Amino acid sequence: MTEETIGSRRRAAVRLKAARKHKPSSQKWLLRQLNDPYVAAAKERGFRSRAAFKLIELDEKFGLIGKGARVVDLGAAPGGWTQVALERGASRVVGIDLLDIDPIAGATLIKGDFQDESMETALAEILGGPADVVMSDMAPNTTGHTATDHLRIMGLAELALDFAFKHLAPGGAFVTKLFQGGAQGDMLNLLKRRFAQVRHAKPEASRKDSRELYLVATGYRPDAS
């Protein structure tokens, strides 16, 4: 056994011992993090969150982020999706969040509400044109009540879609997170009218016990009614 292996096992043992000192809910989260290969892979590749791998999978499946693309990341903190957009060839990436985001080389990060009227002027200056991709991995603070959480995330998705309608270029793509439930019918009907293709996907990086899925709409048609 090498010194590196021994050291790695010792560090894991220390983290496990530390996790056992927390209350059960925190302990469960810490243990899950320790055993999650995507958490380890994110650290290894320098991504700020395991969610980065969800966008990688979605992009590989649907070809969302072309070279030179202009991308807007809504609810961007801590920045994993913004990092992926840059890595996959986007030329201009804007991350927007109410929370602070540590700087990311090559990206413009804005602390604020993407619904503010002032955002439109700022984006036009930064992007130099309409966005090719508007993406949102936003999620509400969950209550544990399935129906309530579903309605809350639908509210966020609708706000993101309204933003996309204002800022997407013809042929552009929209990606948003949802929780499984029955309230997305009207949104899907609208998307099918305004985009050439609308699909659902649950990336492998999504946890098995998670109700999340991603709605991916491509081929934006701004003049469709």
Swiss-Prot record:
It catalyses: uridine(2552) in 23S rRNA + S-adenosyl-L-methionine = 2'-O-methyluridine(2552) in 23S rRNA + S-adenosyl-L-homocysteine + H(+). It is an enzyme of class 2 (transferase). GO terms for molecular function: rRNA (uridine-2'-O-)-methyltransferase activity. Keywords: Cytoplasm, Methyltransferase, rRNA processing, S-adenosyl-L-methionine, Transferase. The active site is at 177 (proton acceptor). S-adenosyl-L-methionine binds at residues 79, 81, 97, 113, 137. Its main location: cytoplasm. Its EC number is 2.1.1.166. PANTHER family: RIBOSOMAL RNA METHYLTRANSFERASE (PTHR10920), RRNA METHYLTRANSFERASE 2, MITOCHONDRIAL (PTHR10920:SF18). Belongs to the class I-like SAM-binding methyltransferase superfamily. RNA methyltransferase RlmE family. This is Ribosomal RNA large subunit methyltransferase E.
